Amino acid sequence: MKVLIKDNYDELSEVAALEILELIDKKPDCVLGLATGSTPVGTYQKLIEYYKKGKVDFSKVTSFNLDEYRGLNGEHPQSYKFFMNNTLFNHINIDKKNTFILDGLSNDIEKECIEYDKKIDNKGGIDLQILGIGGNGHIGFNEPSEELSISTHLTKLKTKTIKDNSRFFNSEEEVPTEAITMGIGSIMKARKIILLINGEVKAEIVKKLINGNVSTKVPASLLHLHPNCTVILDKEAAKFI
């Protein structure tokens, strides 16, 4: 695991965006794994800026999102489909037919999960996976547990995750209690992984991630086992390492 510490969030976002630009330049039809939440927003804003300057072409790019809340339709302002369209896809020339996001309203979740993993495999796998980390160490919605699911699956959200995500909703009670997420195995298949972490609020979990043991109790720690993973931190997130 390679660790980069940048001075601030803007620099962190710039480094991540340039990694994506370099990949698209080398492989215009690359497959990106994308994350939601507040951390990657700066990276997406940088990508939009580069697109508007004519420095990147997304027309052949395919993307797969990590997760989606169970029970929210794609028009709900807190669904991850809405987030991705509003934050990135509507502002670049990516073909929406090549943007894949799990269906939180699927009547057959097991089938939805199996088919999602098949779609990734049929596209040749993910070239670059962007990740954030939860305050309890989750990646995607792979929550701390005695054991972790390998493939895409339905999961119940931990109390801390619901509380952390309540800032995006009007109240904690509105936060869905379940989500569909790519599994640890699905994530680890990516040829390259970039984990973005910013802010003092993440400093404690960063200490566990970097200095602790590999454990399913800190799902992100399994990234130590990936052959090509880079963690990009700002100084606030890195204060305890």
From Swiss-Prot:
Q: List GO terms (cellular component aspect).
A: cytoplasm
Enzyme Commission designation: 3.5.99.6
Q: Does the keyword DNA-binding apply?
A: no
CDD domains the record matches:
GlcN6P_deaminase (cd01399)
Q: Which UniProt keywords apply?
A: Carbohydrate metabolism, Hydrolase
Catalytic residues at D67, N136, H138, E143
UniProt pathway annotation: Amino-sugar metabolism; N-acetylneuraminate degradation; D-fructose 6-phosphate from N-acetylneuraminate: step 5/5
GO annotations under biological process?
carbohydrate metabolic process; glucosamine catabolic process; N-acetylglucosamine catabolic process; N-acetylneuraminate catabolic process
Q: Name one GO molecular function term.
A: identical protein binding
Q: Name one Pfam family in it.
A: Glucosamine_iso
- Swiss-Prot/TrEMBL catalytic activity: alpha-D-glucosamine 6-phosphate + H2O = beta-D-fructose 6-phosphate + NH4(+)
- What broad class of enzyme is this? hydrolase
PROSITE patterns in the cross-refs: GLC_GALNAC_ISOMERASE (PS01161)
Sorted alphabetically, which PANTHER family does this protein's record hold? GLUCOSAMINE-6-PHOSPHATE ISOMERASE (PTHR11280:SF5)
UniProt similarity note = Belongs to the glucosamine/galactosamine-6-phosphate isomerase family. NagB subfamily.
Q: Any idea what job this protein has?
A: Catalyzes the reversible isomerization-deamination of glucosamine 6-phosphate (GlcN6P) to form fructose 6-phosphate (Fru6P) and ammonium ion.
* The protein's name in its UniProt record: Glucosamine-6-phosphate deaminase
Query: What is the organism of origin for this protein?
Result: Clostridium tetani (strain Massachusetts / E88)
Q: What is the lineage of its organism?
A: Bacteria, Bacillati, Bacillota, Clostridia, Eubacteriales
Gene transcribed to yield this protein: nagB
